[in-house]
Every structure is written in C-alpha cells, then in structure tokens.
Amino acid sequence: MITIKKGLNLPISGSPEQVIRDGNAITEVALLGEEYVGMRPSMKVREGDVVKKGQVLFEDKKNPGVVFTAPASGTVTAIHRGAKRVLQSVVIKIEGNEQITFEKYTTEQLNQLTSEQVRQNLQASGLWTALRTRPFSKVPAVDATPVSIFVNAMDTNPLCADPQVIVQQSAQAFEAGLTVLSRLHEGKVYLCKAANASIPSPSIANLDVKEFAGPHPAGLSGTHIHFIDPVSATKFVWYINYQDVIAVGKLFTTGELDVSRVVSLAGPQVKNPRLVRTVLGANLSQLTANEVKDGENRVISGSVLSGAKAAGPVDYLGRYALQVSVLEEGREKEFLGWIMPGANKYSLSRTVLGHFSKKLFNFTTALNGGERAMVPIGAYERVMPLDIIPTLLLRDLAAGDTDSAQALGCLELDEEDLALCTFVCPGKNEYGPLLRQALDKIEKEG
C-alpha cells in the first residue's frame, strides 16, 4: 500500500449520501468539444439531423479513426462554436430508443480477444475516447500502444461518490471491462483503489492491484502514475475511470453502448446531496432543477477544485466528470474583511480563526483577495505529495519557461494535479491553464 501524507481534504459542507437514486428526467444531452485536448472535429452531422445512439457525430482530423458518438437517439438541435470556431457542444434532443449495435462476446470469448478486436470495438463505439494518455491527457491515437494502463477505482475529490457503491452495482461488467483492457496490450493493467476497499477484480496475469491511502490527491490518476510507473517525453501510459470500465464491459458483453452515469450531486447549495443516476452529457439545468437552494449559484461539471462551470452552450455533464457540484456565487464584498477574525472562513494558514475549527464550511466562489504575484510561504509544498519541487515548477509555468518546467516534472501532471496548488495560492493564481499552455508548447516543439 502506498500512503500519501501531504495533501488536503477540503472541509466543505454538503457531502452526498452514499445511496444511488434516480435523477431528474433528462430530455437533452450534448458532447462537449473543448474537453478533448487538441481535438479538431470533422463534422459528420448538421443541425436538424436525426441520429441513433452510438452514431458518429464527428471525427478528430488530427487523429483519424478517433470518432465521437451520440450518447442518445434524437435530433441534433444545435452545434455551438466559440471563438475561432472552436467546437463547444453538439446538442441532441432525446427522442426514441434507436441505437447502433456493436460486436458482443461471451465471458469465455473475452479471455481470447485479440488487441485488434478490442481496438475495433472501442473505436467504432466511441468508447476509445474514455482512454487518455499521460503525458498530455489526450485521447490516444488509434494505433498507439501504452507502456501500461491505469484504472482509477478510487476518488478523494471533495464531495465525491464512493466508487465501491457504484462498482458493486455492476460488478460483473466491471470485471469484464478489466478483462477487455488486459487484452488491449501485453503490458500491465494497474487497478488503483483505496485501502481496504471492496473492489472486485478478475484473476488476470497482467492485472496488478495497488492500494492508496491518505488525503486528496491520493485518488488522482496522476498520483497513481507518479508512484507506480512515471512517464516521460518518450514513455506514455493510458488511464481510465471506473465507470468507463463498466461501460467497456457492458459494450463487449451486450453489444450496446452504455451511457449511464452515477454522479455525486452535492455542495453547500444542494438541498439533498446524494448520488444520482443520469446519462452521459446530461443537461445540468434539468438535472439540478428543484435541487438547489435559492440565490445565485454556480453549477460545476466535476469537482469544486478542478471542474468546469456549466452554463450556456456548455451546460452539460462532461465526458470525464463524476460529480456535479453547486456553490454560491461569492459576489458580496466584506467591509474590512482582512482585519476580521474570520471564524467562518477556512484557510490552510493560521491567518483566520476558521483554520483551528473542525467544522465544515459553506464555501463560495469568492477568491477572498485579489490576484497578485506568487508568494512562496510553503503552502504549495504542504499539498503536493509528488516528488517534485512545486514552487520552482509553478514559477517556471508562470514565466513560460517550458525547458525548466519539463525538467521539474510538468509532463507527469494534468490540470487536476495542480488544483490544490491553485486553491492554497496566496496570489490567487490559476495554475491549470498555465500548465496546459506549457504542455501544448512542449508537444508542438517536440
């Protein structure tokens, strides 16, 4: 077992009840284009087209063969584009139950699958996009081969769902998915879970179960990869979350694309925080209807630390999101707030009374201060368990020095790995976008 000592479990109120219930009825779903790093779509549908579940909506021009399929049958009602014609979302109004079917196999046949059979089924169904590479966090090329594959069956994000509850509902499909992934390549498949967690796993020669313990980010794939099989500019691994593994298992055993999702609907502004069953790409305005408290709220697709604001053309559940978090918009300014004792405020440092409290806090979106230069007071080191020097790395990211940032380990990271550094930063700097700029530049320059 690998134990993480550095990190932070955010004391936020609104934790979900770990019981799965049906969410609100969803009549509209969407695929979000900006979730896929570096993707340039070649559209296969236009507004007004009627599509089946599993039908190709667009293909990646930069990565031929990687297709993105419809999560539901219905009519394409909108194709939203942003600045520079960047694809924001393809919206489908759900109608009917028509779907495209794919190859299916018996349990015995799963153990005899070839890598080519696995690739063909995953790519045809669009489930290939559930896999991501490290470094760069991109959907892998159709002919690429990883050194190893990481299955993340744990979660330490604030307000997260317990993977045990969800996996136990689909244990056979989860094991089938692990079997399929083990046939994808000859290297190791690492199943990463929390210490003593009841996560089923089949007896497969190249499956290795690893346990992690400690505060967040102990449950992030970046942490698992760093401690088990670190990457480099020439060494790539792939990773996938546990709910997508279940979807892979159902695809290969039933021949149908499974787009169901169990997400944590939680946060200080949620009336009844719990786990809800919904669909991939669900309209979050519909999912959160009558579920949130009065006031101006921000709905987040994903974690409060690293999720994306869901509004307008991107008001939908993300491809990789396992949470829907709701916070109050913190627009009110506090008179002389800097001099108050701050009993109802949380801080990692001993600057407010809330630091010494054991209670949970109603966090808002307020920054509690203005943006300024980096202040190296040791805050980053307290929440960074990886074997890197965070202050120097973050300085290089802010300065745009990609050579030094690469030497300090930025290739191992994704935006979510720096989310805690952003949270504790005295200068209120956003390090996720800076990391992405550096990674894009490194990849472009080779």
Swiss-Prot record:
The keyword Phosphoprotein does not apply. One of its GO terms (biological process) is sodium ion transport. Its EC number is 7.2.1.1. It catalyses: a ubiquinone + n Na(+)(in) + NADH + H(+) = a ubiquinol + n Na(+)(out) + NAD(+). It is an enzyme of class 7 (translocase). Keywords: Ion transport, NAD, Sodium, Sodium transport, Translocase, Transport, Ubiquinone. It holds the Pfam family NQRA_N. One of its GO terms (molecular function) is oxidoreductase activity, acting on NAD(P)H, quinone or similar compound as acceptor. The keyword Transport applies. PANTHER family: NA(+)-TRANSLOCATING NADH-QUINONE REDUCTASE SUBUNIT A (PTHR37839:SF1). Composed of six subunits; NqrA, NqrB, NqrC, NqrD, NqrE and NqrF. Belongs to the NqrA family. NQR complex catalyzes the reduction of ubiquinone-1 to ubiquinol by two successive reactions, coupled with the transport of Na(+) ions from the cytoplasm to the periplasm. NqrA to NqrE are probably involved in the second step, the conversion of ubisemiquinone to ubiquinol. This is Na(+)-translocating NADH-quinone reductase subunit A. It comes from Pasteurella multocida (strain Pm70). The gene is nqrA.
